[in-house]
Amino acid sequence: MTTSAVKVLIHGASGRMGKALLRLAAEDQTLQVVGAVVGRSPSQRVVDGVPFFAASELGGAPAFDVAIDFSLPQGFAPILALCAQRGKPLVSGTTGLDEAQRAALRDAAQQIALVWASNFSLGVAVLTELVERAAGTLPGWDCDILESHHVHKQDAPSGTALTLGEAATGSGAQPRYVSLRAGDIVGEHTVQFTGLGERVELVHRATNRDIFARGALHAAKRLIGKPAGSYRVRDLVL
């Protein structure tokens, strides 16, 4: 680890993404995880040199350069408020936010640099751009978004599907959604444009959850030093 390592606070450290973030950050000499926040009081206060805190103790979190949040909607407001209070950037991949929480995000972007995204993979960033272009180039074509995930994923359509739908809608399409929950599928998204006698399919398949964690860590590094505002993943990784 270098003396100028970026100090990272990971919020939602007990989830699948949180665990991946902890593991990958430990392998990155440019990062130092100064705190890991979990929902309940942790059974161990320090794991592999990383201090663990309960969500109720968030206000006492150590100094950090950037926070990364992959938690649940009910835990989102406190980490957003902490970052705004301390003037620190936030990277969040928490899905299922309601309109009030989205409004809070927009308000916070007046004070801090932040990026909220349903998906931090490089491939999905490219897919989103392609969907925008296809929707604008194929007016009048039917647009369908099919998404598949593991059986434990609760929100449907997925946040990524909705993001792709927003990209399509912004270019004039009217997307419909189909969701599948089966087995241990990490994540698959197909955006299908259907015209008369022809069909275009744009597909992204994730086979390893590490791609999302790597993208979030990369975005966190790039967000430091940015002026206040709401950024897209593609603004930071492409």
UniProtKB/Swiss-Prot annotation:
**Would you indicate the residue range of the signal peptide?**
none
Record keywords: Amino-acid biosynthesis included?
yes
This chain is encoded by the gene named dapB
Q: Record-annotated residues binding NADP(+)? A: R40
Q: State the source organism's domain of life.
A: Bacteria
- Report the family membership: Belongs to the DapB family.
Protein's name according to its UniProt entry: 4-hydroxy-tetrahydrodipicolinate reductase
User: What species is this protein from?
Assistant: Xanthomonas axonopodis pv. citri (strain 306)
- What is catalysed by this protein? (S)-2,3,4,5-tetrahydrodipicolinate + NAD(+) + H2O = (2S,4S)-4-hydroxy-2,3,4,5-tetrahydrodipicolinate + NADH + H(+); (S)-2,3,4,5-tetrahydrodipicolinate + NADP(+) + H2O = (2S,4S)-4-hydroxy-2,3,4,5-tetrahydrodipicolinate + NADPH + H(+)
Q: Which GO terms describe its biological process?
A: diaminopimelate biosynthetic process; lysine biosynthetic process via diaminopimelate
Keywords, in A-Z order = Amino-acid biosynthesis, Cytoplasm, Diaminopimelate biosynthesis, Lysine biosynthesis, NAD, NADP, Oxidoreductase
Compartments reported by the entry: Cytoplasm
Binding-site residues for NAD(+), renumbered to this chain: G12, A13, S14, G15, R16, M17, G93, T94, T95, A117, S118, N119, F120
Any Pfam family: DapB_C
GO MF, any single term:
NADP binding
Q: In which pathway does it act?
A: Amino-acid biosynthesis; L-lysine biosynthesis via DAP pathway; (S)-tetrahydrodipicolinate from L-aspartate: step 4/4
Q: Name one GO cellular component term.
A: cytosol
